[in-house]
Structure formats: C-alpha cells, structure tokens
Amino acid sequence: MGNIVGIDLGTTNSVAAFKLAHTDVVTAEDNTPPDRKLTRSVVALDQGKIKVGNSAYNQLQNDPENVIISIKRLIGRGFNDPVIQEQLSRFGYKITKSTQGTDNSLSVWLGGKEYQPEDIAAEILKKLVQNAQTHQAKTGQKSIINQAVVTIPAYFNDKQRYATQIASGKAGLSLRELLPEPTAAAISYSYSANSDDVKTLLVYDFGGGTLDCSIVTAVGNQFIESAKAGDLWLGGDDFDHSIIEFVKQEVARQEGLNNLDQLIAKMPHYQRVRLLGELKIEAEKAKIQLSSQPSAEIITSTPLLDELGMAVPIQVTITRQKFEQLITPLIERSVKICYDVIKYSDYPLDQIDVILLVGGSSQVPIVQQKIREAFPINQVLVHPNPMYAVAEGAAIVAAGLTEKVTTVSRDYCIELVNDPRFIIIPQGEILPVKKFHNFKTEADGQRLIHFKFFSPDLVRKDLDNTDRDERIGDMWLALDQPYPRGTEVLVTVELDEQNNSLQMMAALKNKPEVKVSCSFSRGGINEEISRQVEQRIKELNAAANLTETGVQNANEIAGEVIKSANQIYHNDKIQSDRLEAAQNKLKELENFASEERDIAQFYQTMFEFVLEVCDSLIHPTQKQRLQTLVQDLNQALE
C-alpha cells in the first residue's frame, strides 16, 4: 500500500483509501457504523483535548459551542463574504474575523482559543492518516503515511484550494495532488487499465455541503475533463436546514407563536446553543430515516422557552411527502447546474453516455427520481459505492495509474482602473496554464501597484441573476525606484490547480533584470499590513501637505513596507523578523499621516511667520533658536 493515501475530505464525512491489487477503503473501530468506513468530519474540544470523528459528533448535543462541523464550508472564506454572513446563524460555534488578518479571512473558536479553518481540517486529515496507518498495520504493512492525494470540489476557487493545501501541510502530509471530486468519482467508476472503451460521463456529485457537476471522458486509464460547474452552498446541510425551518414553523403553528427565531434568540445562551445543536442532530436523523420510512419524529430534550419563560416541548412529525416538497427546489437547482455544465462543454446531451450519481445526498430517493425525470432514464446510474467513490478514485490516482487532462474551474479576474473585471485566466483553459500581461503605472513616481483578484461565480449568476464575485486575494508590487507614468510592468500569472495555487511574478518590461517584489496574500497578516499601507497613502494624498521630498520619502518607506510584507510568509509560515521589519516600517509611514505631523506643520508655519514679520523685534539668541527649530521641523517633515 505504501506511504501515500487517497483522501476524500468531505463536509459531513471523510474517507481514506488505498489502491494496490484492488481498491481498499480504510475501516476504523471508531468510524460510523455499520461498515466503519466513514469518519465524521467533526472536531471537538473535550477537557482541553481535541477529538475527531464520531466521538466529537456525539458531543454536539451537550456542548455544541465546542464542536466544529461543516468546516469545509468555511475553509478559504472571508468573514465578510456575503454568504458567510447569511449562514452564520446556522453554526453553533463562534466564527469571527481573524485577529491576525483582514475581513478576507476568518477564525473559529474552541474553548476560548482561536483556530483557522485550515487547523480544523488538518485535525480531520490527521485522524484519517492515523486510521489508515492502523488499517495498514492489520495487513502487515508498516509504512509511515506522509503523502496524499486529497479531493476537493471541482468548483472550489483558488483561495479554497490554497487553504486545503495549507491544511494538508499542517497535517504533516506532502500533497501529491488536489483532485476534483467528480473526476475522482469518474476514475473510480471507469478505470480499466487495458480497456479501449470510450465513455463520456456527466458526474453528479451531491454531497453534504457542495454540489458538483463535471463532464469527463474516460478511456482505459485516461480521463479528460471538459467542463465543470457547481454550487458550494448546496448539499445535505441544506436539506437539514429545510427540516429545521419546517420544525420551527410547526411548533409556532401548534403553540400559536409568532416569531420563533426571536424566542430562540432570547433564550439563555447555553439553552439556546443546546437546542440548536439538538435540532441539527434530529434533522439529520430524520433525513436519513425518510429515505426508507414514510415519516420521522423530531424530538428535542431541550425545550423552547416562550415569552414568559415557560417550557414549550418540541415534538414534530415530518412525512416523506413533506420532506420531498421542502427539498424539491434545491434538487431543481442542482438539475439546472447539470444543464450549465453541458452548456459549458462541447458535448450535447445525446453524446453523454452515463449520468453518474455519487455522494450522500444523491442517495435520497427524490433526488434520484428528479434526475431520472430530467434526463434519459437509461443514462442515469448510481455509482456502486456512492459514499466511497471519491476516495477510491483518489487512491487510484495516488497509485500513479492514471493520465488526466483537467481545466480551469472558473474565471480568474483582476480589478483594474480601466477594466474592473479583467479576465487574466478564463474558465475552461487546459491546465497548467501560464498567461502574460503588460500593466502600466498610472502616475509619475508611482512605487506601488495593487492587484485585487476575484473569481466570479457564473453558476450562481445564472441561477440567481446576482453577481457573486468571490474575493481570492491581493498582490502588491513594490518598484525599486520612482518611474514615470506609463512604465510597463510585465506580469506572469501561472495556475496549476492540481498542485499549486495561483502564482504571480513581475518585472519591468524594458528592464527584465529588475524583478518586482510581490507576494500573493489571501487574508493573512501580510495582507493586513499591505492594506494599512494603501490606507496611509490615501490619507497622505487626501491631505496634500507633503513636499516633493516628503512624497518621495513616503513612497520609499511604503515600498520597503511592502517588500518586507511580501517576505513575511516562507513555506506558509510566518517569519518573525520579516514581520517585525514590516511593522516597524509601517509605523514610520504612519508618522507621515499622523496628527503629530499636522501639529509640527502648524508650529513650522507659525515660527516662519514670526521670523518674517517680527524679525527686527526678536533678540538674536531667540531668533537663532527659532531658526534652528524651523530647520529641525523641516527635516522631520521631509
């Protein structure tokens, strides 16, 4: 089996697998019964110790504040992302802006301690590796697993890919590849080393937190991905939420209550979070039961409290018919995404051989029914191992048995002065891809160039008719000296979604030996420092009170701050000396925009006025002192 494993890092459950003579899905005693192959993607804190998996999930009812679920929905996200703000109330644990970053980052909290989403994902990965090594040991293998192929949603943006890469490193894994989940499922279904049978698959991967659709052509061990689309906020979690909202409405109807959400918000904190935790557990149970039973009961041990503080028991029956009615709009949304991916590809529907269903949510009967109604019934197939297909495909790739062609999942854009939606890398390009572009400085003496990267969500725009531009990160270029307006900077942007995130290099076009200091920031402390530099420059420009020498000095210091900030991270770790240097230079720059500077300018102006108007009235000694003060103030202000 070796030292490499295939991992499906899921929203609700995660799976690890190996490939040797056959594909072997890892089992563990503390995994979810009955087959013990699913590891709950849940992390909890219990008496100061981290727990992962089923034991962590079992803590959700009694201590939901210290149980992290669905971290995959938060990884690589910013606190100010509109969808994050919309979804905050669904999480029982604390989520804030990162204390060491910008609004383009976020943190979760356990036991009063701040964690990055990558830290939580790393704990899940560590657990999977631990289970895999135990599983290997039972077969006589003693390899230390230190490499992995980790799967991600095909529609993940660059920032989410990068965050998954960081999580893998924090788990002690050398990441062989980030593999799109639908492609992994296609490999699991179609891999046959010596076959020359060509099949084109539309993979419908409906999981706990995301919906992905990809078109993949398979022949033998070769797989060509031609298009992909998805919704990163559509999955089993949303089925659960629909059930919870129904329960609230039913309790309100039964008890004659007007606004249940307001009542819940007014409950004592501990009772409120316990109630919400129990509702989540009960909704998930009901969802599973309704796949095989006509109805399910939702009962919580923690009651609701009405306006008078009286206990209102929660006991609601939901029928399969009602459940199907609730989730039908979500399923119809997923069908539209299938048609989107067909539109993005070169394949008409009649040239698609198989519509392959994988993922936990695809096992809900009404989901399968709606897909069979939307597409030719003879094309729709459920994967033989729908819950493990993605991990199996990752294991086959980890064994080095495939050849693949993949494409860019979505447009990569830069916000420019003359083009706020400049596409630097278009969706559908074959990976890896390298693009070149010339940018010109906008002003004489400009030392800094700021690029803002984002990725538009075309699928959501098609479905909701709203722009959903997902911010990826920022890049500041610091020139080595002032240059005239129109100076051309040649920028090279590289993307290989399998192994690396977005990379960017820059040099002066006419002086290629002059490399421009640059670093791509994704919400960390380097971005916060660079953001403050930009703010200080704006303040100085607004004040318009610097001499030409002062402007040059301010620009020079700003450039030094950026250069130091661009070196803060090395191998994704903070370099304390570079951080200190950047912070010191930032303080120096802040002095140019400070209140003390305005006071110094006031005294400089007053002293010069006194020397000019009252020259003959001032004692020579006093005059000399004033002249010295004016000189000192001039030097300080410059």
Task: Provide a role label for each language-model segment.
Residues 89:
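Active-site metal-coordination/substrate-binding segment of hydrolases
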Residues 1-86, 96-102, 114, 123, ...:
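Oxyanion-binding/catalytic loops of NTP- or PPi-dependent enzymes
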Residues 110:
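Juxtamembrane segments of multi-pass membrane glycosylation machinery
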Residues 116-118:
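Hydrophobic alpha-helical hairpins/lids featuring a short glycine-rich hinge
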